[in-house]
Amino acid sequence: MASRTVSGSDNPTRSRWGLVIAAVLVQLALGAVYAWSVFNKPLQDQFHWSKAQVVLPFEVAVGTIFIGSIIGGRVQDRVGPRPVALGGGVLYALGMMLASLVSSRSQLWLLVLGYGVLGGIGLGAAYITPIAMLAKWFPDKRGLITGVAVAGFGFGAVITAPVAKWLLATLPRKTEVFLPLGLAYLVAILLGASFFRDPPPGYRVPGFVPPTTGRAAAGSRAYTLNEALRTPQWYELTAILALSVACGIAFISQAADAAQSIAHVSAGTAATLVGVLGLFNAGGRVFWAWLSDRIGRMTAFVDMLVLQALCFLALPHARSLVLFFVLGALVYLAYGGAFGTMPATAADYFGTSHAGAVYGAMIVAWSIGGVIGPTVTALLYERTHSYTLPFTVLAIVALVAVALPVVTRMPSEPAPYRTGATPVARH
């Protein structure tokens, strides 16, 4: 069959740029999960849960994201992005609504089940879908566009936090906040995901010739998940993401407390600071993804990790609010950059035909890093009552991680083993 050229401009309502807007809308709703810290104190005050108990729903949500991303990625590659995003969105919103039913201290399990398990799995399925879809639609701007998509996730908490604070101040039972939020998430995801679709067979961007050497891959590889798992590169990329996430989310989990301890600011100032820093998380996803299109993916990861390491070494000595803010902003910027750059990197290395399954499986790095990083940092702080040791350890981890992008190389095409498979063209 002859290749079909689709520029995406024949119908503006179904153009590839329209898909970017739809993807950002979905990611905004999903990124609201990072606003959990807003719920901590109101829930503690009303239900008398401990600190460890009140953060459990969020930890479970982060820990189960990879389940949804693996399942959703595999299913998406078979049935397309729309049903997976819609299904994930419904599960995510249903989890929020279930959490709104919690009415007593003994029902923490229901909050964990709704917000944590159902919400986390639904989030994972809906999160991976627009990333894999846009990687197929934008081979010419793969880094930038996937960065823009996941930037929506970063902005989700920034938008949700003030709304949630207002609702918490007006509702007598604090868990009721999850009902209107869940309904809002559902509407946003259903609206955005209803436009999702994969490009038609033979799709190509007029005038774009995939590079075969240099900084980007040709993208003509067609690795299945099983084939990708047989390469060391899949594990190298997953490790890069896991270590970067562990360092970044460890700081995010302690940012407000660290600002009060190191820079001696008030709790209110620290809360405002964390809200502003969230903008750099979102901005980093776009900036580093865009930059990686120009300087190369691995060079970008080296720069991100070195930047994190230097900031962690300096943070314990940041006695002024301005210096703490600048260093914290750079950490947030690098943390967001890992999420913005890795989807395009995975597509470069393993192609876009099975991008949902391949990158979906890599999301296990998010769950691993998101649990280990904050846990180790909190334990080290409890032992020393200082952030010097925790942040020094994070700096060492980031510096050690630099070795991974330095040694990681493109995989060779796998020998096809599927029945009726044809060899992947080599360039």
Where does each model-flagged region fall?
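Helix-to-loop junctions at the C-terminal end of transmembrane segments
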Residues: 68-81, 285-296, 381-382
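Intracellular juxtamembrane helix-capping segments at the cytosolic ends
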Residues: 43, 124-138, 146, 337-350
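Hydrophobic core of transmembrane alpha-helices in multi-pass small-molecule transporters
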Residues: 108-124, 242, 323-336
